[in-house]
Design a protein with these regions (language model features):
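Glycine-rich cofactor phosphate-binding loops and adjacent beta1-alpha1 units
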Residues: 171-176, 214-293
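Rossmann-fold dehydrogenase core element
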Residues: 270-272, 282-322
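NAD(P)H dinucleotide-binding glycine-rich loop of Rossmann-like/cofactor-binding domains
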Residues: 62-68, 73, 103-183
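Mid-domain Rossmann-like dinucleotide-binding core that forms the NAD(H)/NADP(H) cofactor-binding site
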Residues: 139-141, 146-230, 235
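Glycine-rich beta-strand-centered segment in the early N-terminal region that forms part
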Residues: 26-41, 56-107, 140, 145-148
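Single conserved hydrophobic/aromatic residue that forms the stacking wall/gate
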Residues: 1-7, 12
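C-terminal hydrophobic helical "lid"/dimerization subdomain
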Residues: 259-263, 302-349
Length: 349
C-alpha cells in the first residue's frame, strides 16, 4: 500500500488516498537486518497527516523525493529472514517492532532515547508495514509471548507506546487521592487509561465528545466520565474541589483542548501534550506564577515497549481493535478520518 501524493486536494477530496500495488520483496542488505512477515499493521492518524502533507517538512523538506512511500509504522508479525550478524531470532518467531530504526551509536541512543536517535522511521521516511513484509533492524525487535498475537498488538508499537510513555511520566508523580485527566478516549486514550489504572492510585477523569468513547473509557477503568460539551473545565474544577488536576494528558491537541487542558491543570501540575494540531497560547507570566509544566511526548523507548508488552501479557492492558484486509486500506483510513473506529484499526495482509 503506497502513497504517491501528499497534500493533494484531489487526493483528499476523493478519499482514494493510497494505492494497492505489487512491489519487490524487501531484501537483507545489512548484517543486522531482519525481514518480518507482517501479521498486522496499525492504522494511525499520523498516516492521515502524511497524506495531508503535514509531515512533509519532517519527511522530506526538499519536496516529494521520498514518494511513492509505503505507509505503516505500527507493525508486528513473524520473523521471515535474518542477516548474518543476528543472533537469538529464527524464522517464525512472533515479534513486535519498535518504530524507529536508530543506529545505536549516537548520543541519543547511548542515553536510551531511541525515538530521538539518528536513523530512519519506516512509514514516514522509508517504506513501512502496509505490506506483506518489512525490513527492520535486530535492535527494533521484541519477541512476543505465546499469549499475544501480532495482529492483536501491532498498534502498541506506536499508539500504545506513546500512550504508555505519557502515562508512565504522569504516574511517577501521581499520588493516591490525586487526580489525572485524560482528554480523548480514542485509540491512544483508552490505552493510557488502562496504564494509569495499572500503575497508580490516582482518580482518573476522562473527557470526550463521544458517548461511545466515554463508555469505552468506563470499561477501561475511568473513575469519572465528562462529556466535552463546553463546560468540561468547570466540571473538572468541581470534581477536584476547585484546584484542578495534578496531571492532564491531552490526546487531542486541537479544537481548543490545549487552552482547556491548561486551565484544568493544578498549580505545579503537569500538562502532557500527545495529540497535536494547534498552537499553545499561554502568557509567560501565568507559567511563572502557577509553575505549570508543559511536557511533549514522542513515541517511547525500546525498553518501554517491552514494559508495555509485559502489561499486555498480564492482561492489565487490552487493545480494542477493528480489522481490515490490507487491500481495504482506503476504507480503514476513511473510517479513521470520519471517527468510526472504536479503539484502533489494524490492516491484515
Amino acid at each position: 500500500i503506497i502513497v504517491s501524493l501528499v497534500g493533494s486536494e484531489m487526493c483528499i477530496r476523493d478519499r482514494s488516498w493510497v494505492d494497492y500495488i505489487d512491489v519487490p520483496d524487501p531484501v537483507i542488505t545489512k548484517g543486522s537486518d531482519v525481514i518480518v512477515r507482517i501479521g498486522g499493521a496499525g492504522v494511525c492518524r499520523t498516516d492521515l497527516h502524511v497524506i495531508e502533507g503535514i509531515w512533509r517538512p519532517h519527511m522530506d523538506p526538499s519536496g516529494n523525493a521520498l514518494l511513492p512511500l509505503i505507509l505503516g509504522h505500527e507493525n508486528a508479525g513473524w520473523v521471515e529472514d535474518v542477516g548474518p550478524e543476528v543472533e537469538g531470532l529464527k524464522k517464525g518467531d512472533p515479534v513486535i517492532i519498535h518504530p524507529k530504526i536508530s543506529n545505536g551509536t549516537c548520543i541519543a541512543c547511548r542515553r536510551g532515547q531511541d525515538m530521538h536517535g539518528e536513523g530512519t522511521f519506516p512509514g514516514l521516511d522509508s517504506d513501512g508495514g502496509y505490506a506483506e513484509a518489512l525490513v527492520t533492524s535486530e535492535r527494533n525487535i521484541i519477541k512476543l509471548p505465546k499469549s499475544l498475537l501480532p495482529k492483536e498488538v501491532a498498534p502498541y508499537s506506536d499508539a500504545g507506546l506513546t500512550a504508555y510513555r505519557a502515562a508512565k511520566k504522569a504516574t511517577r508523580h501521581l499520588l493516591p487521592g490525586e487526580y489525572c485527566v485524560v482528554i480523548g478516549a480514542g485509540g491512544l486514550g483508552h490505552i493510557a487509561i488502562q496504564v494509569l489504572r495499572a500503575m497508580c492510585a490516582a482518580e482518573i477523569i476522562v473527557i470526550d465528545t463521544s458517548d461511545a468513547s466515554l463508555a469505552l473509557a468506563g470499561e477501561c477503568g475511568a473513575d469519572h466520565l465528562v462529556k466535552a460539551d463546553g463546560g468540561e473545565v468547570d466540571a473538572i474544577l468541581a470534581l477536584t474541589k476547585g484546584h484542578g488536576a495534578e496531571a492532564v494528558l491531552d490526546f487531542v491537541g486541537e479544537n481548543g483542548t490545549t487552552r482547556k487542558g491548561l486551565a484544568m491543570t493544578r498549580s505545579a501540575g503537569s500538562y502532557y501534550v500527545v495529540g497535536y494540531g494547534e498552537d499553545i497560547q499561554v502568557p509567560t507570566v501565568d507559567l511563572v506564577i502557577t509553575e505549570k509544566n508543559i511536557i511533549g511526548n514522542l513515541v517511547g523507548t525500546w525498553a518501554e515497549l517491552t514494559e508495555l508488552m509485559e502489561l499486555a501479557h498480564r492482561g492489565l492492558v487490552d487493545l480494542t481493535t477493528k480489522e481490515y484486509a490490507l487491500k481495504d486500506a482506503n476504507l480503514a483510513l476513511r473510517d479513521l478520518h470520519e471517527g468510526k473506529i472504536r479503539g484502533r484499526a489494524v490492516l491484515i495482509p
